């Protein structure tokens, strides 16, 4: 994630990653300066973004409209050589059934095999009880799973691993399913230094 004040630091961030042997794995949303730098340094990070929740008379029409809205970014990420991760962030667009439907639509109708799903536990508190079923549905399309401590009702929403009631079982479910893709830890706490937050996980 980033804010306007971080834009001037984009290039230095890339240089520091290179200096310390770190992969620039993913970038949130779209920014022209970032995309220019990706081309300059020949980087191909995953691009994570949400699709809209359009109003339509049928589920099929909503899926098609959501997919159509993503087409400029679908084409741009393909040219960049980057995977595009549809990001669950609540609402209709954050439901696994809809993430899969939009992903399938883009792959089948627009040859967008680089499009997949980024599933965030911290936006999935409503999926705790049926996580195994939903993981199976999403698994063929997953680009990354981001972990989080998980309590009922998102109390609190952001929680270090090992401090919640449900994340151990959810991680066991991920292992049992044979998921072998990237696993992420996000630092979403403004009150804690990033190094401290990541080490806690």
Report residues per predicted region.
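N-terminal pre-domain/capping segments
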Residues: 1-44, 68, 108-114, 139-140, ...
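Hydrophobic faces of well-ordered beta-strands that scaffold small-molecule active sites
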Residues: 1, 22-28, 43-49, 84-86, ...
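Surface-exposed, active-site-proximal loop segments in enzymatic domains
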Residues: 9, 13-16, 37-38, 51-64, ...
């Amino acid at each position: 994630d980033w804010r306007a004040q971080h834009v001037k630091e984009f290039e230095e961030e890339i240089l520091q990653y290179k200096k310390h042997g770190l992969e620039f794995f993913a970038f949130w949303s779209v920014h022209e300066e970032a995309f220019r730098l990706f081309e300059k340094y020949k980087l191909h990070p995953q691009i994570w973004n949400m699709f809209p929740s359009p109003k339509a008379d049928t589920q099929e029409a909503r899926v098609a409209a959501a997919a159509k809205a993503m087409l400029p970014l679908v084409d741009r990420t393909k040219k960049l050589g980057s995977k595009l991760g549809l990001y669950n962030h609540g609402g209709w667009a954050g439901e696994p059934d809809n993430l899969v439907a939009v992903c399938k639509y883009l792959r089948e109708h627009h040859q967008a095999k680089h499009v997949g799903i980024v599933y965030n536990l911290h936006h999935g508190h409503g999926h705790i009880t049926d996580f195994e079923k939903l993981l199976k549905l999403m698994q063929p399309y997953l680009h990354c799973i981001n972990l989080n401590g998980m309590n009922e009702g998102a109390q609190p929403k952001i929680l270090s691993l090992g401090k919640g009631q449900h994340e151990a079982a959810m991680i066991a479910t991920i292992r049992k399913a044979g998921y072998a893709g990237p696993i992420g830890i996000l630092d979403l706490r403004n009150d804690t230094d990033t190094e401290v937050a990541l080490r806690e996980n």
